[in-house]
Swiss-Prot record:
Listed Polar residues bias regions: 352-363
Organism from which the protein derives: Mus musculus
Protein name, UniProt field: Translocating chain-associated membrane protein 1
PTM characteristics: N-glycosylated.
Gene: Tram1
Keywords associated with the record: Endoplasmic reticulum, Glycoprotein, Membrane, Phosphoprotein, Protein transport, Translocation, Transmembrane, Transmembrane helix, Transport
Residue ranges, Lumenal side: 51-76, 143-159, 214-217, 273-297
Length: 374
């Protein structure tokens, strides 16, 4: 992300610079149109599809919970409209954090262009990872994921979700979709775009896969685990920009990164390879959302393993690069010995002149003049 220079002149309407400077205001107006649509009966039915979660199912109260009935949700095609609206919300929040927090810090710290771009990236991602990690942990605790790990595969397919779980997934999809237009809004360098596209695409692929295959329990646990490790990395990088001697956070992150990859593989194999493989119902059924067949299980495990291997490969390259930079910084400079020339002509040239500059020769030195006078 390049530094945005503010100019006193107003750019032409709907020009490239106009869209970059005012994209948050334009998106805010679009979001307000959906909210205003809720106020009128004619447009309320269409607007509510974008704003509220769809596919609500009311489960009647059981004997254990006779006081109230449970409202659960499943997914459908209308979720695309909801994701679109909250993608607009994510763009607005992104602009607020950028203008009122990160830009003010950048003006105080006077970062270079490279550090400015990385600082903005880590600032935005650390805020998102912290929020998503806290929210996901709250869901895990409230729905007894921690006290009963078998909930990851028991009673599959998990085609019904609580409001918090579905809203969490909708928000995740909306956030990572908003990252595509942000590449344009933040003037991302061309050489950084392929890396960003791979990064965003992997998130969308795995989040959408867990959501559509009704593996939302496993996906939620893995996301919280991954987000915590990523939050530690980006918050450490923010501290590093203010003090380049800061290395403790990176050391802790390196350990937790490896442990996170290991835990991800263990939980995935335990859930998909053992838990779902021993389930009684192993027939493909789109109506009930049951995808517990051998081909799907192999595809899920393969995608997770390949992604973890790719992340470890990037991690090892990153650590090797840091180690080389640290070694080069710590290595003492090599002292060059002056070359000793042989022969009378070289000695005479050295005495009488160096690089064309005339110097005093041996006969004119104070010591030799003293010997002659004696």
């Amino acid at each position: 992300m390049a530094i945005r220079k503010k100019s006193n002149k107003n750019p032409p309407l709907l020009s490239h610079e106009f869209l970059l400077q005012n994209h948050a205001d334009i998106v805010s107006c679009l979001a307000m149109l959906f909210l205003l649509g809720l106020m009128f009966e004619v447009t309320a039915k269409g607007a509510i599809i974008f704003v509220a979660l769809q596919y609500n199912v009311t489960r009647p109260a059981t004997e254990e919970q006779a006081t109230e009935s449970a409202s659960l949700y499943h997914y459908g095609i209308k979720d695309l409209a909801t994701v679109l609206f909250y993608m607009l919300v994510a763009i607005i929040i992104h602009a607020i954090i950028q203008e009122y927090v990160l830009d003010k810090i950048n003006r105080r710290m006077h970062f270079s262009k490279t550090k400015h771009s990385k600082f903005n990236e880590s600032g935005q991602l650390s805020a998102f990872y912290l929020f998503a990690c806290v929210w996901g942990t709250f869901i895990l605790i409230s729905e007894n994921y921690i006290s009963d790990p078998t909930i990851l595969w028991r009673a599959y397919p998990h085609n019904l979700m609580t409001f918090q779980t579905k809203f969490f997934y909708i928000s995740q999809l909306a956030y990572w979709l908003h990252a595509f237009p942000e590449l344009y809004f933040q003037k991302t360098k061309k050489e950084d775009i392929p890396r960003q596209l791979v990064y965003i695409g992997l998130y969308l692929f795995h989040i959408a896969g867990a959501y559509l295959l009704n593996l939302n329990h496993l996906g939620l646990v893995l996301l919280v685990l991954h987000y915590f490790v990523e939050f530690l990395f980006h918050i450490s990088r923010l501290f590093y920009f203010s003090d380049e001697k800061y290395q403790k956070g990176f050391s802790l992150w390196a350990v937790l990164f490896v442990l996170g990859r290991l835990l991800t593989l263990i939980l995935s194999v335990l859930t998909v390879g053992f838990g779902l493989a021993r389930a009684e119902n192993q027939k493909l059924d789109f109506s009930t959302g049951n995808f517990n067949v051998l081909a799907v299980r192999i595809a899920v495990l393969a995608s997770i393993c390949i992604t973890q291997a790719f992340m470890m490969w990037k991690f090892i390259n990153f650590q090797l690069r840091r180690w080389r930079e640290h070694s080069a910084f710590q290595a003492p400079p090599v002292k060059r010995k002056p070359a000793v020339t042989k022969g009378r002509s070289s000695r005479k040239g050295t005495e009488n002149g160096v690089n064309g500059t005339v110097t005093s020769n041996g006969a004119d030195s104070p010591r030799n003049r003293k010997e002659k006078s004696s």
